[in-house]
Every structure is written in structure tokens, then in C-alpha cells.
Amino acid sequence: MMENYKHTTVLLDEAVNGLNIRPDGIYIDGTFGRGGHSRLILSQLGEEGRLLAIDRDPQAIAVAKTIDDPRFSIIHGPFSALGEYVAERDLIGKIDGILLDLGVSSPQLDDAERGFSFMRDGPLDMRMDPTRGQSAAEWLQTAEEADIAWVLKTYGEERFAKRIARAIVERNREQPMTRTKELAEVVAAATPVKDKFKHPATRTFQAVRIWVNSELEEIEQALKSSLNVLASGGRLSIISFHSLEDRIVKRFMRENSRGPQVPAGLPMTEEQLKKLGGRQLRALGKLMPGEEEVAENPRARSSVLRIAERTNA
């Protein structure tokens, strides 16, 4: 059954404007979600333009299939495989822009049955594609205590990672957790110091979700592929929602906006320097939501939009 949860697209105009849409261009929306970005891109494309959308959430795919437009196509899969999708369509080096809206969507958070939220009791799942891979409950029941602690520390930046991991393992030995409420209660009980502005389970839920969905690896692979598929002058427009995501995007754009790093004093000919290649991207800066958008949609508060352009190198 299709859910009817409202989804307000964050930095909608800014992210699409960052693509610098050409009416006859070919674009990728790597995170279709509920189609906010895709619909705006389509409204700016001419008859010859094309939009390829990607999402691994079956509910997003169902929404995408309601778009009756010959310029639009949808792929059910992870955006990390965008290089494969582009190669299959013989479009390597022909993509004029890629948009990624990272992290979990509002409909996923608001639907208790998806298991993403500690605020709503539901199955402890957290998979963006519930048809593939281990659920959060399955992973927590089989993982070693040290591995759980590492995930909480690395992906949640949780200061009490070891205590929480121990509590999770002990609880699962007594009776396996299958509900989000159970995990939230275990985490709260294991947290010795409470933050009055943040639920004690916030970081744990973020960390487990990122691990279950391989979110950071997905981002890194998609960014790497983007250099191969983008046309000269093609744009990357990427919205991040927490520091772990933004760090990856920022580092990627910075590293690929530099020319070849040659030690001072190393004798090299012009020909040798050419072979090393020049910079592959030109970083065009970052944007953050204004006060009005944050007031209307509090989830936009932590978002950061970064834009870069593919160079000729």
C-alpha cells in the first residue's frame, strides 16, 4: 500500500539551479525520493532533454512510475551504480548534471514500518531497500560487541559507543530486539549523560542506518563514477545532511579541483606534466538553507549544498 507522507524537498530551487540546466541536456537525479527535484528538472528541459532517475526504495519507484513523460526514466537500484547505468545506455561522458540528495528521506523517517525512527515504534529494519540485505535487527543480533561499538563511534560519533554496544549485546542474548522502541530504550538506559536537546538514541540510530545501507561507501563510489560520466562543463549538485556525508563531498571536490601534486624541485617536462592530468573539477561553492526554509522545514537546518563543474582535463 502506498503511504501518503508529506515530503518537503530541501534546497529544491538551489540544487536544481546548481545544475545549470540546458534544455537539451541529459541529467541524473540519483535520489528520486518523492520526485521534487526530478519534476523541477523536467519543467526546465526541452523536448530533446532527458532525465534518468535512480532510487533503491521500492516506494520511491512506485511514485516515479506515475510520471508519464517520454523524457523521464527510472531505475530501481543504488546510486553508487550510476556508472554502470550510464555505460549501459552508451552515455559515458555525455551527462550534463548529477543531483544527489543524501541520507534518509522524510517519508522513510515518518513511516514507522520502515524502522528508521526512534520516535515511532516499528520493525527494527532501517533498510532503504527492504528487499535486499540484512535488517538492523538481524545485524545487531549477529554482530560482535566490538563491531557494534566501532560502528556507533565511526558513523554516529557516539561518545558512549562501548557502553551502548555492551547493552545491545546483553539485551539480544536475553531476548532479541525486533522493534525500534526496544533499541531506543536500551540505548537510553545505557547512556549515563543525557543531552536535553537531543534524544540519546539519535546517534545510534544514525550509525546503524548508515552501516546497514553502506551509505558512505555509496557516496564515495557515486562521486568517483561522476568524473567518468560527466561531460565537460557538467555539474555536480549534492545536498548533505550531516558532517560525515559533507566531509566526503567536500574532500572529493577539493582534491579533484587541484592540479597534479608534484614535489617542489622535481624536474618534469611539459609532456610529463600533461600525462599527470590537470584538475578534473571546479568547485563552485556551497549554499545553506535560509531562515525561512528552516522555519518551514526544521529538518533542513543541517543541510549543505555543494556544487562543482567538470573541467576539460
From Swiss-Prot:
It holds the Pfam family Methyltransf_5. It comes from the Bacteria. S-adenosyl-L-methionine binds at residues 35-37, 55, 79, 101, 108. It is found in: Cytoplasm. The keyword Methyltransferase applies. SUPFAM superfamilies: Putative methyltransferase TM0872, insert domain (SSF81799), S-adenosyl-L-methionine-dependent methyltransferases (SSF53335). One of its GO terms (biological process) is rRNA base methylation. Its EC number is 2.1.1.199. Keywords: Cytoplasm, Methyltransferase, rRNA processing, S-adenosyl-L-methionine, Transferase. GO terms for cellular component: cytoplasm. GO terms for molecular function: rRNA (cytosine-N4-)-methyltransferase activity. It catalyses: cytidine(1402) in 16S rRNA + S-adenosyl-L-methionine = N(4)-methylcytidine(1402) in 16S rRNA + S-adenosyl-L-homocysteine + H(+). InterPro entries: RsmH, SAM-dep_MeTrfase_MraW_recog, SAM-dependent_MTases_sf. Its main location: cytoplasm. The keyword Transferase applies. PANTHER family: 12S RRNA N4-METHYLCYTIDINE METHYLTRANSFERASE (PTHR11265:SF0), S-ADENOSYL-METHYLTRANSFERASE MRAW (PTHR11265). Specifically methylates the N4 position of cytidine in position 1402 (C1402) of 16S rRNA. Belongs to the methyltransferase superfamily. RsmH family. This is Ribosomal RNA small subunit methyltransferase H. The lineage of its organism: Bacteria, Pseudomonadati, Pseudomonadota, Gammaproteobacteria, Enterobacterales. The gene is rsmH.
